[in-house]
């Protein structure tokens, strides 16, 4: 009965125009140059368009890679309600590791204080996995069945059941400039666009691919996801205006424009949302102005999956307990193509930057603990072909205690790299689609959208995009999660939970 009442409550919140409208008053503190803290109150209306029956298109750059092919296979298998059998029995596709699929949050309390929780996707009217249509590009020509077979992620029984569907998915030719990925990747390249020495034609080709995909599948909205190999860092942040960036693409004499920016520009010009799930600095500041011009979003960077996600928990735990981390050393080795690409220094540097930055906000928030110091923070990644996708991660947290005592946490983490990443890709798709339907009415009646970087999605990224205004981003795991949970609550008129719960403490 309580479940039925809750569902009925949510249905009542949509108006005649299928807009969920909720007024919200929020307070925050600001400190001025005289170190005086002032409380500021703002009142807004949050407007959420109801989820329609339209399908959502997802176009993956690097669809034949481990993440792209496995996500596609998982979605197809889920849509077909397939199961598979191995020595442990019969299994169904469940997307364990997905916040969208399994994340719940407290929405109310019983009289005895026991929490009543709901799945996040049931609080807001979110898209279903059945609503997704997948396509994309790759610089390798193999159909997705052959790619999945080569990648060795799926159980063979499940792969056989998906064979016909996966064989029908052929990657579109991809944008390839050999200077931006590791030299050990070039021998496999056999499916590229043929616009020699003209990068603007590559942009136009990407636009054409997106529009054709929309037309062929009767789609209105597309999310474009970079899931390709890590590129070396680019120097395109020097362009303060997007007009200068576009001009350089049209006349790239110095070869400074990487493939990922070509896709980002093409996505923006079709009003598609662009997501960068790799470490490189694709989303340069001028692209935010460009995305705003086209009323779309540009989101990233680098999926936060295993070792780094755990670091965002443990480093916060130590500092929040008054324990001072002196050094954090992270070593890992893996044998998939991601590891192979990261063997070269330019590509590794992109990854190192995103992994190291994950503790910055924790240091900033604990000045008394760290003073002017920072923990020694080292990252090591090695390619070991024999272990394949079964990544080994070893972390040591060396910390200082009372009376100069020392504490060491040593963690050995063995995980399937792709099977951690794919459910997070699903999360990004689903929450990005939801947030694209939300606008805000300010006190002056102006209607605005989220900032172009969609920073509430920082929960899913190692190096969350700060946007044009260089928004301060929290990396600490539970701060990010509470922000996501509480925002979804206020959209549907449910009070946020600050865990003070004075009604039970007084």
Roles of regions detected by a PLM:
Residues 64, 140, 305-306, 330-337, ...:
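Glycine-rich beta-alpha junction loops
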Residues 10-278, 282-293, 307-314, 413-506:
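Metallocofactor- and cofactor-centric catalytic cores in central/energy metabolism, strongly enriched
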Residues 299-371:
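Conserved anion/nucleotide-ligand pocket segment
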Residues 272, 296, 323:
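Short glycine/serine/threonine/alanine-rich loop segments
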Residues 1-12:
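Asparagine-rich low-complexity intrinsically disordered tracts
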Residues 352-452:
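Glycine-rich, aromatic-lined ligand/substrate-binding cores of catalytic
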């Amino acid at each position: 009965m309580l479940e039925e009442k809750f569902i009925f409550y949510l249905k009542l919140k949509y108006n005649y125009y299928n807009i969920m409208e909720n007024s919200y008053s929020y307070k925050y503190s600001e400190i001025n140059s005289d170190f005086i803290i002032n409380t500021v109150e703002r009142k807004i209306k949050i407007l959420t368009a109801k989820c329609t029956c339209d399908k959502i298109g997802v176009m993956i750059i690097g669809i034949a890679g481990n993440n792209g092919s496995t996500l596609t296979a998982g979605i197809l298998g889920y849509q077909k309600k397939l199961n598979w059998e191995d020595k442990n029995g019969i299994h169904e596709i469940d997307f364990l590791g997905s916040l969208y699929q399994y994340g719940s949050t407290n929405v109310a309390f019983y009289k005895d204080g026991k929490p009543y929780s709901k799945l996040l996707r049931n609080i807001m009217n979110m898209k279903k996995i059945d609503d997704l249509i997948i396509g994309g590009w790759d610089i390798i020509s193999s159909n997705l069945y052959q790619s999945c077979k080569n990648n060795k992620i799926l159980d063979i029984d499940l792969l056989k059941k998906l064979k016909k569907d996966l064989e029908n998915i052929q990657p579109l030719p991809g944008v390839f400039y050999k200077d931006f990925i590791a030299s050990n990747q070039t021998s496999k390249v056999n499916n590229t666009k043929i616009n020699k020495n003209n990068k603007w034609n590559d942009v136009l080709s990407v636009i054409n691919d997106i529009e054709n995909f929309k037309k062929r599948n009767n789609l209105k909205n597309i999310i474009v996801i970079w899931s390709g190999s890590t590129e070396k860092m680019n120097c395109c942040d020097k362009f303060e205006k997007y007009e200068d960036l576009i001009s350089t693409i049209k006349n790239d004499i110095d070869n400074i424009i990487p493939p990922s920016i070509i896709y980002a520009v093409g996505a923006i010009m079709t009003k598609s949302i662009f997501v960068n799930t790799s470490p490189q600095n694709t989303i340069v500041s001028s692209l935010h102005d460009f995305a705003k011009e086209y009323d779309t979003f540009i989101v990233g960077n680098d999926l936060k999956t295993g070792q780094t996600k755990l670091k965002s928990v443990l480093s916060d735990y130590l500092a929040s307990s008054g324990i001072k981390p002196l050094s954090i050393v992270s070593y890992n080795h893996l044998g998939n193509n991601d590891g192979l690409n990261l063997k070269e220094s330019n590509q590794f540097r992109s990854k190192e930057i995103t992994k190291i930055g994950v503790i910055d906000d924790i240091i900033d928030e604990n000045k008394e603990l760290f003073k002017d110091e920072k923990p020694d923070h080292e990252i090591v990644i090695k390619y070991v072909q024999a272990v394949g996708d079964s990544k080994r991660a070893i972390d040591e947290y060396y910390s200082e205690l009372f009376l100069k005592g020392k504490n060491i946490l040593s963690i050995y983490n063995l995980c399937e790299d792709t099977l951690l990443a794919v459910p997070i890709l699903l999360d990004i798709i689903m929450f990005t689609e939801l947030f694209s339907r939300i606008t805000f009415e300010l006190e002056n009646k102006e209607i605005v959208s989220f900032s172009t970087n969609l920073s509430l999605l920082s929960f899913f990224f190692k190096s969350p995009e700060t946007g044009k205004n260089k928004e301060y981003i929290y990396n600490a795991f539970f701060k990010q999660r509470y922000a996501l949970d509480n925002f979804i609550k206020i959209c549907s008129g449910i009070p946020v939970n600050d865990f003070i719960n004075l009604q039970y403490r007084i």
